[in-house]
Amino acid sequence: MGRVLQKKKNRSSTPKQKPKRTGQLKSGKKKINVLGNAIIAQNWDRKLTLTQNYRRLGLVHKLNAPTGGSEKRPTKDGRIEELPEDPLHIRGSAKASAKQAAMGETRVERDPETGKIIRVIRDEEEIEIGGRKVKPSNPLNDPLNELSEDEAAQQPASQRANAKSAIVQQLERQADQEGQAVKAKKPRHQSKREEEWIMRLIERHGENYSAMARDRKLNPMQQSEGDLKRRIRKWKANHSS
């Protein structure tokens, strides 16, 4: 029999105290270690916010377009610095995308039966190449071609300075070195015992891989037929010369 007090606790509606979840925020989202990189940790200013630190380092803390609350800094002549919107930002809603649409007149092509708009005809869409109508300024339909070439000149000096800061260059060099290290990684070599095991399988079953996979004595770990094929193919390649 259990104690009466313990039974009352089990029936109580008072929530039990849950163990503290390390690495998780109050909102339930996973806590991200922004100082996981040694270069960023060395240049991180704890007095600044995450957005301010990333802007100072020349990085971006999110790809989505800002929806408000961004900091507007005054320039030397007393005006407010207007940060131009990055055209590569991900739009969060259709309303935000509609605000970017230029107002004007254009021609449309409608379906003669339903009256629905099939396509919008603009002045620069009159060129036809290979049976397809393309823009004269973008015959290959490159989505990045529509970005302004003078975009860098329109940005403020503070943003242009951070575009290729020394920290960004260090991070790029680090990423390049890690990529080269992965490419130069030596492949796994089969051990002597693995080669002896493969030889015993071939001596007993020949090229019958399905029988090898079903063999409980020689294949106690129940390696699959495809895995055995890959191991034997690698063994043959090493012993062919």
Curated annotation (Swiss-Prot):
Query: What's in the keyword line of the UniProt record?
Result: Nucleus, Ribonucleoprotein, Ribosome biogenesis, rRNA processing
Spell out the Basic residues composition-biased ranges.
230-241
- The record's region (Disordered) falls at 1-30, 64-195, 209-241
Instruction: Report the subcellular localization.
Output: Nucleus, Nucleolus
Which GO terms of the cellular component aspect does the record hold?
A: nucleolus; preribosome, large subunit precursor
- Biased composition range(s): Polar residues: 155-172
**Biological-process GO terms, alphabetical:** ribosomal large subunit biogenesis; rRNA processing
Mark out the compositionally biased spans (Basic and acidic residues): 70-89, 106-122, 209-218
What's the superkingdom here?
Eukaryota
A Pfam family of this chain: Nop16
Where is the major localization of this protein? nucleus
Q: How does it assemble?
A: Component of the pre-66S ribosomal particle.
Describe its function. Involved in the biogenesis of the 60S ribosomal subunit.
> What family name appears in the similarity comment?
Belongs to the NOP16 family.
Q: What is this protein called?
A: Nucleolar protein 16
Q: Which gene encodes it?
A: nop16
